[in-house]
Amino acid sequence: MAIKVLVVDDSSFFRRRVSEIINAESRLEVIDVAVNGKEAVEKAKRLKPDVITMDIEMPVMDGISAVREIMASVPTPILMFSSLTHDGAKATLDALDAGALDFLPKKFEDIARNRDEAVSLLQQRVIQIASKRAFMRRPVASSTPVQERPQSTLNRPTTGLRREAPAQAPVSRAPVAAKFRASGKKYQLTAIGTSTGGPVALQKILTKLPANYPHPIVLIQHMPATFTAAFASRLNSLCKIQVKEAEDGDVLQAGVAYLAPGGKQMMIDGRPGAARLRIIDGGERMNYKPCVDVTFGSAAKIYADKVLSMVLTGMGADGREGARMLKSAGATIWAQDEDSCVVYGMPQAVAKAGLSTEDLPLERIAERMLVEVGLA
């Protein structure tokens, strides 16, 4: 049976092209369209589609308000279309906070010209999030900025510096009521890589960390260049730790999370205790900018076994080769479990390669981190 899709957009051209692209995939079927958020809510309740594609800026009711109403009444996987502007980024993050599962840049030229990459990406995203209808959740609870958070001064100098693994021991899966035990390892860096579903996952984790988190955190989230500054700002307003978009030459400091800028590669240079970030363009042939493998690989060279790393929800296999390098250096690698992932791609690639030691539900990752670093 085909996946039923409701297409929502106030542009007749965009509705028609998105519908044509979706219907070109035999596993998908557009069952109706809506021209504004109010109509989308009504049709979502009546038709109960498997997936909804949603514009943000629409008359009568905007996309964010529609997402909130749909999630409150008939939770459905929603894929947002967003403009590549700072305001568009903020609105998209609001939509994800309200319950949307994923987003795609709204590129009229690519859609109009039927470019293979844009067509395939849209079809794949719809199919991927359709599998998560049972996963649907209420909006993220924490949306109130932390008050009177002490601010530290960040040191920002202007310059700075395959083969499949054999089968490993079974991955440890924590029962719901299990109490975690620290491994006893000492860490100097936490590294987290993610893609689809990552903004919500990172918010859930980072908002639970205290301001005295004992070492730096590097974050690699697949995201367009115009989105990462807005995402870092949002996280910074919600978290006790500091969160910033990484800049070339940043000196890594404890209690600060550095988000890799979209469209760039983030590497670590120097030595433990005096490490700096290098932000570079990277090769055009790289599939992802930023790329989890790139940052993880550089972390392995600098910090070796002193890295606590995690691969969270996301499509594809980015992070697997970086995790392989971390594993060879003796670092700790965790993967998000399948049930709590929006897309079980990246964590699955790491787990199947025998690289992760623990398979954790999203809701307990922060708790596990605090135990592991000696704060719980």
From Swiss-Prot:
Residue(s) carrying 4-aspartylphosphate: D55
Segments traversing the membrane: none
Gene that this polypeptide is encoded by: cheB1
Alphabetical GO biological process terms: chemotaxis
Function: Involved in chemotaxis. Part of a chemotaxis signal transduction system that modulates chemotaxis in response to various stimuli. Catalyzes the demethylation of specific methylglutamate residues introduced into the chemoreceptors (methyl-accepting chemotaxis proteins or MCP) by CheR. Also mediates the irreversible deamidation of specific glutamine residues to glutamic acid.
Top-rank taxon: Bacteria
Family as reported in the entry's similarity comment: Belongs to the CheB family.
Keywords, comma-separated and alphabetical: Chemotaxis, Cytoplasm, Hydrolase, Phosphoprotein
GO molecular function per UniProt: phosphorelay response regulator activity; protein-glutamate methylesterase activity; protein-glutamine glutaminase activity
EC number: 3.1.1.61, 3.5.1.44
SMART domains documented for this protein: REC
Residue stretches making up the Response regulatory domain: 4-121
Subcellular location: Cytoplasm
PANTHER family linked: PROTEIN-GLUTAMATE METHYLESTERASE/PROTEIN-GLUTAMINE GLUTAMINASE (PTHR42872), PROTEIN-GLUTAMATE METHYLESTERASE_PROTEIN-GLUTAMINE GLUTAMINASE 1 (PTHR42872:SF3)
Domain notes: Contains a C-terminal catalytic domain, and an N-terminal region which modulates catalytic activity.
Primary localization: cytoplasm
Protein name: Protein-glutamate methylesterase/protein-glutamine glutaminase 1
Naturally occurring in which organism (per UniProt): Vibrio vulnificus (strain CMCP6)
SUPFAM superfamilies referenced in this protein's UniProt entry, alphabetically: CheY-like (SSF52172), Methylesterase CheB, C-terminal domain (SSF52738)
Post-translational modification comment from the UniProt entry: Phosphorylated by CheA. Phosphorylation of the N-terminal regulatory domain activates the methylesterase activity.
Metal-binding recorded as keyword: no
InterPro entries xref list: CheB-like, CheB_C, CheY-like_superfamily, Sig_transdc_resp-reg_Me-estase, Sig_transdc_resp-reg_receiver
Keyword Transport assigned: no
Domain CheB-type methylesterase: 183-376
